[in-house]
């Protein structure tokens, strides 16, 4: 990869630089390193790439749907009479677009169809053993009796949207990627925790992608065992013998041989240096001549052994008795009789030495076991039961895995082969094979994804080497041993599950069907695959309801990595190690962003530049360094690769030639920091922020915050509610525009072009056209207007371009929720003072000025959806109607004639949104009721009110109504009106497109005809003649020039093609609209009402900054009482200064100072703009001042190149403040902030004199005042406050339900009782436990003091019943066979107790 487009917040530079109105003001950036931008262009690439690989879009992809079907087919009849073959797969187009699927509540999917070929062979005879086929005499191949090819539907496949989400039943969902242990082999130890002796117990585990796990482990006696799927362990030699190895094969495989040759003086043995390292001699070391070189009991070091070898020692003598205790490699046989003296693997004993001399054996091969560097572990395991055969081993393994069965030998062999050696039942995957080859240094084909005998042998060899002290165990938390499973892999696995079920069904059907009349569609049930996919998307732990609070929460959710889920960890069993930050996370997984609760460390986020390769391993980019010079080449490295290189920090100083300034640099190498020469450096980080995630990269001065507060800050940004008017932060990091563009919340231009029309009111689309080679291209961008998100926040896109603007590809042309001119805007810049104020900001409480509420600074719009379902009941259909029984007319005033609320109506708690009645069985009226009906003529309703009412805690404005009527059911007037409005919108869109095309061709045709030779017919010139004609008339003008005539004809053809296409799109939309709606069984109509609720800031709402500085609003103070500056400007927010030192998030103070400088710089620019020419030319003063502000920045050159008009326009945009960028780990230093404060004509300390708004007196000390970017979080007090008098009870315990969602009660628990006991409040306690408790029987309600009976009847007796919780306790005691009976003392009542 070549070094990509440099990140530059200054936009285009060069002479005549002009800032477009729709562009954000460039930021004064303090970045000291050059960034790459191509890696940041698509933040949700992790989702799209994975799904595209599954679909098979990527070229050269080995996966894909096609390969899944090819692996399944052909399917043959069990008797071989017929075969079902796969021909091709076709994925269709979605019936409805994404918006329509959300609106209708259906799944965004595409139909899948496969072409199958069913072939029936001609057979002569069929038996259980074989089938005799009829052979064609010409081709000598089997004759075909019948063949049918057919396209068959296999169900719908959910499609990923352009934003990386899935729409399931009208709800956007995200498939979270999963971190799991990579397939392959892993070596581990118990770290001495198993046995009290502290001895290390080593183990190995082969983990496949699919199939049985194979474990190897030592025990305390150094015997090697193996387990399959964690069942009962067996000696490892059982497995080796099941693989066909004999005792000699096992010994030859795991041990080297040493040949001892008899001589007159002893046994001659080859001298090998490595075998003597650290050995203490048990006998004198002699050369072959008998000369003593080293005395016995001497320890030989490696240096001594090498010196002996250098002195010419090639063989040494071992005394005849010195072979005692050595293990023979092969059977020692008496040459005369053939009797075995010593079996292979046995140790030489004293009696054996005598026999060896007696039988005159001249040479012996011993196993190289010295108990120091080579241990007898495999040998000892073999001798546990060395006489078992292969058949015995196979049966023993079978008995462990399938106890209670008695199969034959063939079944046992087939079972064992299927465990590890058949692709249908065992799959290492390509990743597992690569890891296995790398770990064991094997050279086996990557496509062989089953185990081999060599794999198992080499695993045991490496395990033995570990026990012998060679090598180290694996770190399971190393990212080289963990991989990411993304959405495409999950769906592929589910797809394979569904295909296997389909295959079994086809096999069953083949065994019973008559082949003569069968066609391919008879074999396939499309519901099988659809059911599997539906279950996964609906109920999987990793298929999650998308977090759509704001654009950042969407991006973060799509980039999330989870260690939980199927095949992963559980939060209860996950230890500290797997949750902790690992050195290999650098540049791959963010060390900051993770949940605070029990999922901490298990759920993380992908680092900002990281990407996932085709094998699922995370890679991080680095710039290549050659001979101390940083090049523009960027390479992505795996965690296993980067440990071999020296990697410098991105902040390392470079000269103008990109060469390191310092001779020695700190570099990362092998997980540690080392100091190396610059010539030895291999790579350098691409950016200082590459270690953090998207959310953490938005926190300015992150390096000045405590890690815990940085974690809270990154998490709370995702909870920020989009506000009524978005405002980008004055102090940002430069990542705001990147996140906004990559989130999908903005509308980006698809091509370069000129804005032709922007319709902001009637139809929310932006229309542009672009010349695509020789043809016109009309692009219509639909914007979302006041749509509801998953979390009830408001999504509203606003065009920021105007007619005539020239836009480039990927320019932002419409802002979304929480977006300001293409920059992420989650909160507001507000004036903050750090001080105490009457104790109202005690313990992180926040004091707010009433002016903030009045100006709607933190006001947000939330959209609530309410649904009314009209069903067909056994007594008749429910009906939507305005005349609802027992409801007064005032409550129905905002309904239309149909009975549905009008758009724009102001509704409050209890308002009727949809009037609906449900039939009820006829009831017999009492005589007095019949008399009243006869006298007064009242209508007797045979239905009950089942209308949709607004819940108690909602108040707002109805902004939209959707009516879905079942296809075939008569539509009401409201649904017809809604449909007509949609038709008008489609027609308007079509007409706009035709107008754009016609206008373009009209201009082009006039230009062409002006060059032609036309008769003037009394006109002064050709242009006046053409101007008087319409486009249709211009097409009909006769031309004598054949070349121009041909061009006109070509233009007419293109024009007709575009117009036809516009009409075709319109007709398709009308057809879909007229098709109707497929509603669930028994549902006639669904009415959805959307109510916009305005949430003003109020006490109890939660607010936070970007540094983890959170708090709850305690009081809204009148603006006149708030502290104010010397010029009378009141402070917006007061924060407690004591919340800073203990939390150690100093970043908020630095942001305060920098924000104070930014605003005051803007004020100074504003004063220059408002001043006259007395002090000199305004333009030149502004240019000089901005050049000083942007000193050392690229923006300084841009300011110098601006025209006077462009500069004034640019300066006017700076009135509210000069935007700053403090990138992560590259924030401005103290001296730089002080310089800006001095330029802004304010105190360099950042503190000012504040005056008490109530007394007007100045506070004793200066106060830190500045501008902070504050967020309003979605923890709103309106959603939390709740009260209940009487409500639902649990069926079993008869206790009130809990929580606001269940309209539950407030528990008065044990500790609350203790509190009342401590105060001695006996009557209050009795009242809480009885009168105000959970008695569920209205007939036994106690008479409460100060109730109706007290005031009207004068009854002041205080009578209490038994609370239901006491009855529950009694019943539980009775379930324990303890009979509890309450005795009532009539003399003891509360009325006679004095």
Curated annotation (Swiss-Prot):
Catalytic activity: RNA(n) + a ribonucleoside 5'-triphosphate = RNA(n+1) + diphosphate
Domain of life: Bacteria
Biological process, per Gene Ontology: DNA-templated transcription
Pfam families: RNA_pol_Rpb2_1, RNA_pol_Rpb2_2, RNA_pol_Rpb2_3, RNA_pol_Rpb2_45, RNA_pol_Rpb2_6, RNA_pol_Rpb2_7
GO molecular function, one term: DNA binding
Record organism: Anaplasma phagocytophilum
Disulfide cross-links: none
Keyword Plastid (UniProt): no
UniProt record similarity statement: Belongs to the RNA polymerase beta chain family.
Protein name per Swiss-Prot or TrEMBL: DNA-directed RNA polymerase subunit beta
Record key words, sorted: DNA-directed RNA polymerase, Nucleotidyltransferase, Transcription, Transferase
EC number: 2.7.7.6
Any single Gene Ontology cellular-component annotation: DNA-directed RNA polymerase complex
Main function: DNA-dependent RNA polymerase catalyzes the transcription of DNA into RNA using the four ribonucleoside triphosphates as substrates.
Self-association state and partner proteins as the record states: The RNAP catalytic core consists of 2 alpha, 1 beta, 1 beta' and 1 omega subunit. When a sigma factor is associated with the core the holoenzyme is formed, which can initiate transcription.
């Amino acid at each position: 990869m070549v070094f990509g487009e440099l990140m530059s917040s200054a936009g285009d530079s060069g002479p005549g630089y002009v800032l477009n109105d729709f562009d954000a003001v460039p930021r004064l950036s303090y970045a000291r390193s050059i960034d790459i931008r191509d890696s940041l262009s698509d933040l949700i690439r992790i989702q799209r790439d994975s799904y595209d690989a599954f679909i098979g879009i990527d070229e050269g992809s080995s996966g894909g749907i096609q390969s899944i079907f090819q692996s399944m087919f052909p399917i043959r009849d069990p008797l071989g009479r017929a075969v079902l073959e796969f021909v091709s797969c076709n994925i269709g187009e979605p019936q409805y677009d994404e918006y329509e699927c959300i609106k209708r509540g259906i799944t965004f999917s595409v139909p899948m169809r496969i072409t199958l070929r069913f072939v029936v062979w001609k057979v002569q005879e069929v038996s259980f053993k074989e089938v005799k086929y009829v052979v064609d005499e010409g081709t000598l191949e089997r004759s075909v009796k019948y063949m049918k090819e057919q396209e068959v539907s296999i169900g719908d496949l959910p499609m990923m949207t352009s934003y990386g989400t899935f729409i399931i039943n009208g709800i956007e969902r995200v498939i979270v990627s999963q971190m799991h242990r990579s397939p392959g082999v892993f070596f581990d130890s118990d770290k001495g925790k198993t046995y009290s002796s502290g001895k290390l117990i080593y183990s190995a585990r082969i983990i496949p992608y699919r199939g049985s796990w194979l474990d190897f482990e030592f025990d305390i006696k150094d015997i090697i065992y193996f387990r399959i799927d964690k069942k009962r362990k067996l000696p490892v030699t059982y497995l080796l013998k099941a693989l066909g190895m004999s005792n000699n094969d096992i010994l030859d495989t795991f041990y080297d041989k040493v040949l001892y040759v008899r001589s007159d003086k002893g046994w001659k043995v080859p001298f090998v240096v490595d075998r003597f390292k650290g050995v203490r001699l048990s006998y004198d070391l002699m050369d072959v001549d008998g000369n003593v070189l080293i005395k016995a009991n001497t320890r030989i070091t490696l240096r001594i052994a090498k010196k002996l070898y250098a002195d010419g020692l090639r063989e040494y003598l071992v005394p005849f008795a010195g072979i005692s205790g050595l293990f023979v490699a092969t059977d020692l046989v008496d040459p005369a009789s053939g009797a075995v003296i010593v079996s292979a693997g046995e140790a030489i004993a004293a009696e054996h030495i005598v026999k060896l001399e007696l039988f005159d054996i001249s040479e012996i091969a011993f196993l190289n076991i010295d108990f120091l560097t080579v241990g007898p572990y495999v040998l000892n395991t073999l001798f546990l039961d060395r006489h078992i055969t292969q058949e015995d081993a196979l049966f023993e393994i079978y008995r462990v895995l399938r106890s209670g069965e008695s199969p034959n030998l063939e079944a046992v062999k087939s079972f064992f082969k299927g465990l590890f050696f058949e692709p249908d039942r065992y799959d290492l995957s390509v990743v597992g094979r690569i890891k296995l080859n790398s770990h064991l240094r094997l050279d086996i084909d990557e496509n062989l994804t089953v185990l081999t005998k060599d794999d198992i042998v080499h695993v045991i060899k490496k395990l033995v080497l570990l026990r012998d002290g060679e090598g180290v165990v694996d770190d399971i938390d190393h990212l080289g041993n963990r991989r990411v499973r993304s959405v495409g892999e999950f769906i592929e696995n589910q797809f394979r599950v569904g295909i296997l079920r389909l295959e079994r069904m086809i096999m069953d059907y083949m065994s019973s069907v008559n082949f003569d009349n069968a066609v391919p569609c008879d074999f396939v049930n499309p519901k099988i695959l659809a059911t599997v996919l539906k279950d996964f998307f609906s109920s999987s732990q990793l298929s999650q309801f998308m977090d759509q609070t704001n654009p950042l929460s969407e991006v973060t959710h799509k980039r999330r990595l989870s260690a939980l889920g199927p095949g992963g960890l559980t939060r209860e069993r996950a230890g500290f190690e797997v949750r902790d930050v690992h050195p290999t996370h650098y540049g791959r997984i963010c060390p900051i962003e993770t949940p605070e609760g029990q999922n901490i460390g298990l759920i993380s986020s992908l680092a900002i530049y990281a990407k996932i390769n085709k094998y699922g391993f995370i890679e991080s980019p680095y710039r290549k360094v050659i001979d101390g010079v940083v090049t523009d080449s960027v390479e992505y490295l795996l965690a296993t690769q980067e440990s071999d290189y020296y990697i410098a920090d991105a902040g390392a100083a470079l000269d103008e030639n990109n060469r390191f300034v310092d001779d020695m640099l700190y570099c990362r190498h092998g997980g540690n920091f080392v100091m190396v020469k610059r010539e030895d450096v291999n790579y350098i980080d691409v950016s200082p922020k590459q270690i953090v995630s998207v959310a953490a990269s938005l926190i300015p001065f992150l390096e000045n915050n405590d890690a815990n507060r940085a974690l809270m800050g990154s998490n709370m940004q995702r909870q920020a509610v989009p506000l009524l008017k978005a405002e980008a932060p004055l102090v940002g990091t430069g990542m705001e525009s990147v996140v906004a563009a990559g989130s999908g919340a903005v509308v980006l231009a698809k091509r370069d072009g000129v804005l032709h029309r922007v319709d902001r009111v009637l139809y929310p689309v932006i229309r542009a056209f672009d010349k695509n080679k020789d043809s016109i291209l009309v692009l219509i961008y639909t914007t979302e207007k006041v749509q509801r998100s998953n979390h009830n926040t408001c999504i509203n896109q606003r065009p920021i371009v105007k007619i005539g603007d020239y836009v480039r590809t990927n320019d932002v042309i419409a802002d979304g929720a929480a977006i300001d001119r293409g920059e992420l805007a989650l909160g507001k810049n507000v004036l903050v003072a750090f001080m105490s104020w009457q104790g109202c900001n005690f313990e992180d409480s926040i004091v707010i000025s009433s002016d903030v509420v009045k100006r709607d600074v933190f006001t947000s719009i939330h959209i609530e959806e309410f649904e009314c379902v009209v069903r067909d009941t056994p007594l008749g259909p429910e009906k939507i109607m305005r005349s609802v029984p027992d409801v007064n007319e005032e409550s129905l005033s905002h309904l239309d004639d149909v009975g549905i609320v009008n758009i724009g109506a102001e509704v409050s708690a209890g308002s009727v949104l949809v009037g609906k009645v449900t039939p009820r069985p006829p009831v017999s009226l009492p005589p007095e009721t019949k008399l009243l009906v006869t006298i007064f003529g009242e209508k007797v309703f045979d239905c009950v009110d089942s209308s949709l009412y607004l819940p108690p805690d909602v108040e707002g404005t109805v902004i939209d109504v959707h009516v879905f009527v079942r296809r075939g059911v008569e539509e009401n007037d409201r649904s017809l009106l809604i449909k007509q409005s949609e038709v008008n919108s489609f027609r308007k869109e079509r007409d706009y497109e035709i107008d754009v095309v016609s206008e373009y061709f009209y201009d082009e045709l006039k230009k062409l005809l002006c060059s032609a030779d036309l008769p003037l017919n009394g006109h002064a010139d050709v242009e006046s003649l053409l101007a008087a004609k319409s486009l249709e008339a211009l097409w009909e003008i006769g031309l004598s020039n054949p070349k121009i005539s041909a061009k006109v004809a070509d233009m007419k053809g293109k024009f007709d093609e575009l117009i036809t296409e516009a009409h075709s799109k319109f007709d398709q939309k009308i057809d879909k609209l007229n098709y109707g709606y497929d509603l669930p069984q028994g549902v006639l109509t669904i009415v959805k009402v959307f109510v916009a609720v305005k949430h003003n800031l109020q006490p109890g709402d939660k607010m936070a900054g970007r540094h983890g500085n959170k708090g709850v609003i305690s009081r809204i103070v009148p603006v006149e009482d708030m502290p104010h500056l010397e010029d009378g400007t009141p402070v917006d927010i007061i924060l407690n200064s004591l919340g800073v030192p203990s939390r150690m998030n100093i970043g908020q103070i630095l942001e305060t100072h920098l924000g104070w400088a930014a605003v005051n710089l803007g004020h100074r620019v504003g004063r220059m703009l408002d001043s006259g020419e007395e002090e000199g030319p305004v333009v030149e003063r502004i240019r000089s001042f901005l050049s000083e502000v942007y000193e050392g920045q690229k923006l300084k050159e841009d300011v110098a190149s601006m025209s006077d008009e462009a500069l004034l326009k640019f300066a006017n945009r700076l009135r509210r403040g000069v935007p700053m960028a403090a990138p992560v780990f590259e924030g401005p230093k103290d001296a730089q902030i002080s310089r800006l404060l001095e330029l802004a004509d304010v105190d360099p300390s950042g503190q000012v004199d504040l005056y008490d708004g109530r007394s007007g007196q100045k506070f004793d000390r200066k106060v830190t005042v500045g501008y902070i970017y504050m967020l309003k979080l979605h923890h709103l007090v309106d959603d939390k406050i709740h009260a209940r008098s009487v409500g639902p009870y649990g069926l079993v315990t008869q206790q009130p339900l809990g929580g606001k969602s269940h309209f539950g009660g407030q528990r008065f628990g044990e500790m609350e009782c203790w509190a009342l006991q401590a105060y001695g409040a006996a009557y209050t306690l009795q009242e809480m436990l009885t009168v105000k408790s959970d008695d569920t029987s209205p007939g036994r309600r106690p008479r409460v003091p100060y109730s109706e009976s007290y005031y009207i009847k004068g009854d002041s007796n205080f009578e209490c019943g038994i609370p239901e919780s006491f009855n529950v306790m009694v019943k539980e005691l009775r379930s324990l066979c303890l009979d509890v009976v309450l005795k009532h003392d009539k003399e003891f009542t509360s009325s006679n107790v004095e």
